[in-house]
Amino acid sequence: MQAKAILRHTPTSPRKMRLLAGLVRGKPVDQAKAILLNSTKGASRNVMLTLKSAVANYAQLNPDERVSDQELVVKEVFVDQGATLKRMLPAPMGRAYRVRKRSNHLTVIVDKVKQSSK
């Protein structure tokens, strides 16, 4: 059974968050945590918190099952665009530039590693 965690209205550009989502997609949870800990990107903290939340949700959904981080895999990670705040920045000669403050919604889905039977 898979578990999911969603972080909404994160004040980061979706483009920047998708860079990190691509790094951890399909990886075991322990390996994904190591990647995020060593990342210099500012959004790595938000991805790490959401990943930990998804693992905790998996443990809560399966209370009789003891699983470690090596047994769980990041099945899906996707980033959707959130609300965009539009602001004005004063510009030369009485004009104004539009500043778009973007946000995103991060979804992380974890599942147990499927054992291949040969």
From Swiss-Prot:
Q: Quote one Gene Ontology molecular function term.
A: rRNA binding
What does UniProt give as GO cellular component? cytosolic large ribosomal subunit
The source's superkingdom equals: Bacteria
Which Pfam families does the entry link to? Ribosomal_L22
Family, per entry: Belongs to the universal ribosomal protein uL22 family.
NCBIfam families attached to this UniProt entry: rplV_bact
Q: What does this protein do?
A: This protein binds specifically to 23S rRNA; its binding is stimulated by other ribosomal proteins, e.g. L4, L17, and L20. It is important during the early stages of 50S assembly. It makes multiple contacts with different domains of the 23S rRNA in the assembled 50S subunit and ribosome.
Listed under subunit, the entry gives: Part of the 50S ribosomal subunit.
Protein name listed in UniProt: Large ribosomal subunit protein uL22
Give the gene that encodes this protein.
rplV
